Structures are given as C-alpha cells and as structure tokens.
From Swiss-Prot:
Database matches in Pfam families: Astacin, CUB
Binding site for Zn(2+): 154, 158, 164
UniProt protein name: Zinc metalloproteinase nas-26
Active site location: 155
GO terms classed as biological process: molting cycle, collagen and cuticulin-based cuticle; proteolysis
Residue ranges of every copy of the Peptidase M12A domain listed in the record: 62-264
Gene assigned in the entry: toh-1
UniProt keyword list: Cleavage on pair of basic residues, Disulfide bond, EGF-like domain, Glycoprotein, Hydrolase, Metal-binding, Metalloprotease, Protease, Secreted, Signal, Zinc, Zymogen
Manner of cofactor binding, per the entry note: Binds 1 zinc ion per subunit.
The species this protein was found in: Caenorhabditis elegans
GO molecular function: metalloendopeptidase activity; zinc ion binding
EC top class, as a word: hydrolase
Role noted for this protein: Metalloprotease.
Length: 414
C-alpha cells in the first residue's frame, strides 16, 4: 500500500505532549453568546503536544520528505523500549483504543526492522518522529510526565498517517487561529498542512473526504500552545463547540478513516447488513453495524441502549429534560418530531467540572450528519435557542464519575 494519506494529524516540526503546567492559572472567562455553567472557577486541560524547543530542533531533520505511506497491512509491528510493567500496560491500553474501533492489530515484534517503537523518556515531551510509515524504526517518545492512554493513541494516530484536524486545508471554514496568542515555537503546529507539505517538498497528498469534526482525537483544544491561557488560540466558528475540541476520546470518523484505508472489504460477501445513518459493517464483527454514538440496533436505526435514556417526542409546548442522579450513569436520548419539522432547544441550566475537551459533559448532536461529534457542554452553554438540522436531536450525558447536572428545554418547531 503506497497511497498517500490522511488529513487528521501531526505537525511536521516535531512537538511534545505534556500535562498542562498552568491548569489553575486562568479563570473561566466570558464568551459572547455563551453562558458559564462550570462548577469551578478554573478550567482544567491537558496540553496535547506542547512544544519543546529542544526536541523541535533536534528532530526537525527526521521529518519525512517524500511521499507519505500507509502501513503494508492491518497488522502493525511495534516494540516497547524501557519502562516498567505499568508503562508497558499504558502503551497497550493506548494501542487498544485503535484496535477496539478498527481492524488494526498491533503485533509486538522485537526483531522487526520496520516497526513503531514506543520509547520512555524522562520529562514532559511526547511526540512522533514521522507522519505515516517511514520504512524503518519509527519512534514515538512518551515522556514520563505526559504518559496517558489518549496521548499514546494520539501519537499512534500520527504514525498511522493522521495530520491534525485543525491543520486541514479547509480548516478556515470551521476555525480561526488567534496567531497573536500562539507561542512562536509552536507556529508549525497551526499551519494548514498543504503549507507544511510545500515547505518540506511533499507533493502528493490525497485527503480522505470526511467532514470536519471538532471532536476528533486529533484536534487541539482551544488554548493549546497559548502564550496566555486567558485567551484562545483556536476559536471555532460555531462557538458552542469550544469545549468539544481537545477530547481524549476517539471519534467515530477517526476510526472510519482507518477502516476505509486498511480494511475496506473486510466484510464483503460475509453479511447482508444495510447499515443506516453512516454506519458500516464492523470489521471486527461483520454480523453487526458499527454505529455513530447515540445509535444502535442491528442497522443503526435504533437509539443506543442505556438504563436512563429513551425516546422522546417533542410537542408544540416547551418540555424539559433533566439529568438523572448518579455520577456513573451514561444516558442516551433521542428527541424527535414528525418529518418536515425541527427541534428547537436550549440548555436552560447545568453545572459541570470545566475542562477543555470536556471529560464530564452533556453532548447534543443536532446536525444532519449524525456521524459528527455534537457540541459538548461542560464550561459553557449557548444563551440562545438552537434549531436542529433534521427532525431529531440526540442528547448524550456522560458525567464520568463527577458531580454534574443539566436541564434541556425543547419543543417542536414547524
């Protein structure tokens, strides 16, 4: 396989990942059109790929300067260098995030000369040396101070060929970059990747056509590489997505891109599924559909089962949906109206621990394309009503072990 790769991840000038050193240095600030709904004054965030000046200059020469390659098969050889049992378990859990959602299988092979190498180093630098397969040992450095499952998954995404979402050539339709607040040494991490390709002499790139997803694992959060964390570096055109960016979860479309590249025919002739709503036969089990979050059933036509959600039909009168009690519940609701109508809704109340990338949140999927991550609210909620693009919305509630609550007002709009 030598087809040129994807449009969802890494900067060409190498970078590091670290736990934010200034998580409590800036209070939550006001944003026009949004209302604060946080239960704390200080937002928490981890900084995906905080630039290390030393690492950038040391490794710049190693950036791939030719065609970007896929791996030869869905079996990816890997090695782990250094670290104790806990570190090695962490690496395997990060890898498993890809295996659980895709056909990829990572095979540990200490003898392979063409493999991903996960290397433990002291410090707060985590980075990938190449985008896509380079045809030799490909090091992913995991610093002891930034070793997290999602960091491993994010950096592995780079090795699989992903660019950052916010570096897509169409990104200006979805986000704005506040250049005056971007650290000078991080500039390359915010350039559109076509500019980076030209700078490094890479000419052949064939982007996979997937819509822009604020909830991609490969998207920086709003204050990434900020000179001052009291201001954003990445501003979504739709401000209600401001805390959706920077998630620690894999998005439905992240996995789909990989499955389209490495195993597009895995279930061909093995099933007669008619998957709806952008779902597709699961390459890990061809008897079921892999569905966007919120949908389930044999063909993605039903609501994803949960002990606390359900189907709700909106009327012409305002109704209210309130979150159930409990810190560990996971709830899915579908609010629908007849074809030709829309759902008008607004988060009327709520309280969550604030974090960029929302670890505890209520998510509302109101777009026509239900594959896209909805807007996740944990720090802010829109002050005005929102109207759905179709005759349904999905409400997803994940407190994730934290104290949280929300109320949603909704009604039918003809």
């Amino acid at each position: 396989m030598t087809s040129s790769l994807v449009l969802i991840l890494a900067p060409l000038a190498l970078v590091a990942i670290g736990e934010a050193a200034f998580g409590n240095s800036s209070k939550i600030f006001e944003i026009p059109g949004l209302e604060v709904m946080a239960s704390d004054k200080y937002p928490h965030f981890t900084t995906i790929e905080t630039v290390s000046r030393t690492k950038v200059h040391r490794h710049r020469r190693e950036v791939i300067a030719g065609q970007i390659y896929d791996w030869n098969s869905y079996e990816i050889p890997f090695q782990i260098w250094g670290g104790d049992y806990n570190f090695q378990s962490l690496i395997r859990r990060g890898i498993r995030m890809w295996e659980d959602s895709t056909c990829l299988r990572f095979k540990e092979n200490q003898q392979s000369r063409d493999a991903i190498r996960y290397v433990l180093e002291k410090g707060d630098s985590c980075f990938t040396e190449y985008i896509g397969r380079n045809g030799g040992h490909q090091d992913i450095i995991i610093g002891s101070e930034c070793a997290e499952e999602y960091v491993v998954a994010h950096e592995t995404g780079h090795a699989l060929g992903f660019w950052h979402t916010h570096q897509r050539p169409d990104r200006d339709r979805h986000i704005s970059i506040n250049w005056k607040n971007v650290m000078e040494e991080a500039t390359a991490s915010f350039m559109p990747f076509r500019s980076m390709l030209q700078a490094f002499g890479i000419r052949q790139v064939s982007p996979r056509r997937v819509p822009y997803d604020y909830g991609s694992l490969m998207h920086y959060h709003a204050v990434a590489h900020a000179v001052k964390v009291s201001d954003f570096t990445i501003v979504p055109k739709e401000l209600k997505y401001v805390t959706t960016m920077g998630t620690e979860k894999m998005a439905f479309l992240d996995a789909k891109v990989i499955n389209d590249i490495y195993c597009p025919n895995a279930c061909q002739g093995r099933n007669h599924l008619n998957c709806l709503a952008g779902g597709y036969p699961d390459p890990n089990n061809c008897n079921v559909c892999r569905c966007p979050e919120g949908l389930g059933g044999p063909d993605c036509g039903r609501l994803q089962p949960s002990p606390c959600g359900g189907e709700i039909h909106a009327s012409d009168q305002w109704q209210t949906l309130s979150s159930p009690s409990g810190r560990d519940v996971h709830c899915y609701w579908r609010i629908s109206v007849p074809e030709g109508s829309r759902v008008r809704f607004r988060l009327s109340d709520g309280e969550f621990p604030c974090s960029y990338g929302c670890q505890s949140y209520v998510e509302i999927k109101h777009k026509l394309d239900v594959r896209l991550t909805g807007f996740r609210s944990c720090c802010y909620r829109p002050k005005e009503d929102t109207v759905s693009e179709s005759n349904q919305i999905f409400v997803i509630y994940h407190p994730n072990g934290r104290t949280a609550r929300f109320s949603l007002r909704f009604r039918r709009q003809a």
